[in-house]
Amino acid sequence: MVGSDGDGDGGGGEAHAPAAPAHHHRRPPRPRGGSGAIVEGFAAALRRRIRSGAAAAARASFGGDSGDEAASGEPSSSSSSSPSRRRGGDSNGAEASSAAGGGGGRGGGGDFSAFTFRAAAPVHRKAKESPLSSDAIFKQSHAGLFNLCIVVLVAVNSRLIIENLMKYGLLIRAGFWFNDKSLRDWPLLMCCLSLPAFPLGAFAVEKLAFNNVITDAVATCLHIFLSTTEIVYPVLVILKCDSAVLSGFLLIFIACIVWLKLVSFAHTNHDIRQLTMGGKKVDNELSTVDMDNLQPPTLGNLIYFMMAPTLCYQPSYPRTSCVRKGWLIRQIILYLIFTGLQGFIIEQYINPIVVNSQHPLKGGLLNAVETVLKLSLPNVYLWLCMFYAFFHLWLSILAEILRFGDREFYKDWWNAKTIDEYWRKWNMPVHKWVVRHIYFPCMRNGISKEVAVLISFLVSAVLHEICVAVPCRILKFWAFLGIMLQIPLIVLTAYLKSKFRDTMVGNMIFWFFFCIYGQPMCLLLYYHDVMNRIEKAR
């Protein structure tokens, strides 16, 4: 078992040396005879190590190809010590391969290397599919290709940004956001500051109702009057004043949020009264509801609800133990960065494309398709930045300041396989409000599921149209139609999901209609309609 390179030390020492396993490499004895012998000895040891490593690699390669666990799972010395696990099958074959290999078992793997590197060794051992064939493509890991796509995406977009800056320069203008017209928007600011009067009025109505001063019917009528006035009042102010589009959008957006909160406040307290007051109390319903959430409203609860990042009222919310100041500062910095990035995308890419485009319904078809596709890429980036800045950063900032515990503001909507799944995941505050105050009440009143979904989308479409049409001061129903057309897409993607199980066809349809076609088309339509209105006014 001891190698012949150690003969210079004498046979006596080797005769009594214990036999070492073939797969363990011992340091070769120091040869005698000067520096030349030393170099020759170490060269021989190096050759043995290289031959052993090559044999092990070959064994792993051939074992993986053939599916032979014995060939791929153990070193060659182990296989040579057990005839039943050796490819040759007997000791004669091992001796022959050892002799042919020149080093027979020394360093482990001599017998296998002699067999592996012979021309007679079989290479094709079983039928196998190509990794990208239809039968094997989903069994492979494509992480490397995904990384390649990320690298290509970063490289291509970096080149486009550099090319755009070299050709057009930096197009950011302060006048695009704030101009002399913005200084005349003080009526909108005063209107915004007066909106808290409506929640205070709703609180007074609930106090009267809980004290049995007014009936439930009167309280309901007063809530309807307050909520309707709250949404009509900002609309009239925006239409009366010649305000900037951005200022009008901010006001009507805040007004819609307050309206949703008022509806939730009135509906929830009405339900609490039904459960806790008079003979309408139902024991089995109370047993399933936390009693802490069945208390009359207080002014502190109302103020917290109006500021909290939620649209659904309840007397108490899960709270965190403290405010993480360092984390909060980092989130604020990120929010400012992504807000600035949105402004850069709008002014550097979207605004020039829209200004130099034609009305999509009046120009040629190819021209409209080219403009929509040109606008789709910056629109996707803008939409993703908007989502991250608002739903992840801004709502988390509010939640951290108020120690609001439930921070599930969105789910993994980007993996949605149907349009219905997307709407249930991308905007959780609105989704919870719709389910709680529209969908389930419709179901409890005997309305079918399909009609309840239609009513939910109808309310959403009206609110979207108000948020866009009022600041632009045009009524074209583009936003309304964009939301209502989601219903046939829901049916289509649900059918595709049932027909092609566990596929991403519905996900591709979602990305196409939302980011490639839908949003750029709506943006072009509203921009040109606003420009036409301004030209007619002049």
From Swiss-Prot:
For this protein, the Enzyme Commission number is 2.3.1.20
Kindly list the residue ranges recorded as spanning the membrane: 136-156, 186-206, 218-238, 245-265, 293-313, 326-346, 382-402, 451-471, 474-494, 505-525
Localization, per the record, is: Endoplasmic reticulum membrane
Q: Say if the entry is tagged with keyword Membrane.
A: yes
Nucleotide-binding recorded as keyword: no
One GO term of the biological process aspect: glycerol metabolic process
Question: Keywords assigned by UniProt?
Answer: Acyltransferase, Endoplasmic reticulum, Glycerol metabolism, Lipid biosynthesis, Lipid metabolism, Membrane, Transferase, Transmembrane, Transmembrane helix
What GO MF annotations does this protein's record show?
diacylglycerol O-acyltransferase activity
Q: Motif FYXDWWN motif residues?
A: 409-415
Extract the PANTHER family matched here: DIACYLGLYCEROL O-ACYLTRANSFERASE 1-1, STEROL O-ACYLTRANSFERASE
Q: What does this protein do?
A: Involved in triacylglycerol (TAG) synthesis. Catalyzes the acylation of the sn-3 hydroxy group of sn-1,2-diacylglycerol using acyl-CoA.
Its family remark reads: Belongs to the membrane-bound acyltransferase family. Sterol o-acyltransferase subfamily.
Know the name of this protein? Diacylglycerol O-acyltransferase 1-1
Q: Which organism is it from?
A: Oryza sativa subsp. japonica (Rice)
**Which gene is the coding source of this polypeptide chain?**
DGAT1-1
